[in-house]
């Protein structure tokens, strides 16, 4: 029975989320806090599954990891979300109206089609942003996320604030979409991302693993060597990796970077400044040597 439950719990959870947003009262849909609460409850539910069917003892959630990860979850859903809205979504929406851009075809599409379109739109953009972060100076913003030394349902929110802002950007505001469909898509993506980071032993149907990112695929992305991380970039929709040739089968048990050094919150925040700080320190050393 337990094996059956953990085989189907991922697709069933996604189905329940979609059903919730289909029947949710208009007053709930109009309140942006509904998606925050729904996503938080989804992550909490998935996190609780670790106590029933743990995947790796070495990834077991302890008090320090819990409070650290909770801090990032709150940061991402409040401060970062607000910044994305004010600095990206609202200006993009204003530009859309100023240019007279309309997409009636999306607005009049069936609810589930709007959800699927929004999921793909967000994930495809995140895929390329994530991939760029592994191939350019942007690695300094993303590397802190790879310094995590264990995985759990909340780990998807852990990272440098600049990275969290960048990966939250999308062009959804350019399209006319039902608000409930957008919130549903965000809730679905949170669920899949939480499943993909969870320390839970799942055995999903093959069709689920074909479309959605699993803990196996994502743990491989968190391998300890930099070159090993350059695959399976999709946070939730692994189909993007399959389409773009970056998918790789496998699983990792040992995760982390730089000899698995765990970063504190302060170290996560200042990590992108390391090259600048190193340069300043080197110049200070040169000046001191010259003064002698």
Where are each of the predicted segments found?
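Cytosolic-side membrane-entry/anchor segment at the start of a transmembrane helix
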Residues: 1, 63-78
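N-terminal membrane topogenic signal
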Residues: 1-12
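A membrane-cytosol interface segment of integral membrane proteins
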Residues: 255-292
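Short, hydrophobic transmembrane alpha-helix segments
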Residues: 20-33
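Membrane-helix interface linkers and caps
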Residues: 42-69, 90-103, 252-253
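Interhelical loop and helix-boundary elements at the membrane-water interface
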Residues: 3-4, 58-64, 153-157
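Membrane-embedded catalytic scaffold of the fatty acid hydroxylase/desaturase
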Residues: 71-258
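Structural signature of hydrophobic alpha-helical transmembrane segments
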Residues: 34-44
């Amino acid at each position: 029975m337990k094996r059956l439950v953990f085989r189907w719990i991922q697709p069933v959870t996604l189905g329940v989320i979609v059903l919730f947003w289909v029947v949710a009262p208009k007053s709930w849909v109009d309140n942006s806090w509904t998606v925050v609460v729904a996503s938080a409850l989804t992550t909490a539910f998935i996190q609780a599954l670790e106590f029933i069917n743990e995947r790796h003892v070495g990834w077991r959630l302890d008090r320090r990891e819990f409070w650290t990860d909770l801090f990032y979850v709150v940061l991402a859903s409040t401060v970062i979300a607000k910044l994305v809205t004010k600095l990206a979504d609202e200006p993009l929406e204003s530009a859309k109206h100023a240019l007279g851009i309309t997409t009636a075809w999306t607005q009049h599409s069936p609810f589930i089609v709007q959800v699927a379109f929004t999921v793909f739109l967000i994930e495809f953009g995140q895929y390329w942003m994530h991939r760029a972060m592994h191939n350019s100076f942007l690695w300094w913003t993303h590397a802190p996320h790879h310094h995590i030394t264990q995985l759990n349902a909340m780990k998807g929110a852990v990272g440098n604030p600049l990275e969290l802002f960048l990966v939250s950007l999308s062009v959804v505001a350019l399209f006319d979409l039902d608000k409930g469909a957008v919130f549903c898509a965000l809730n679905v993506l949170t669920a899949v991302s939480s499943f993909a980071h969870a320390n839970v032993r799942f055995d999903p149907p093959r069709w689920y693993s074909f479309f959605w990112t699993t803990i196996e695929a994502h743990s491989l992305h968190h391998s300890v060597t930099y070159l090993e991380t350059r695959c399976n970039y999709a946070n939730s929709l692994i189909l993007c990796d399959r389409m773009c040739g970056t998918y790789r089968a496998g699983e990792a048990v040992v995760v982390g970077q730089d000899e698995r050094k765990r970063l504190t919150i302060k170290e996560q925040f200042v990590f992108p400044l390391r090259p600048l700080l190193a340069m300043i320190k080197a110049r200070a050393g040169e000046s001191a040597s010259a003064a002698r």
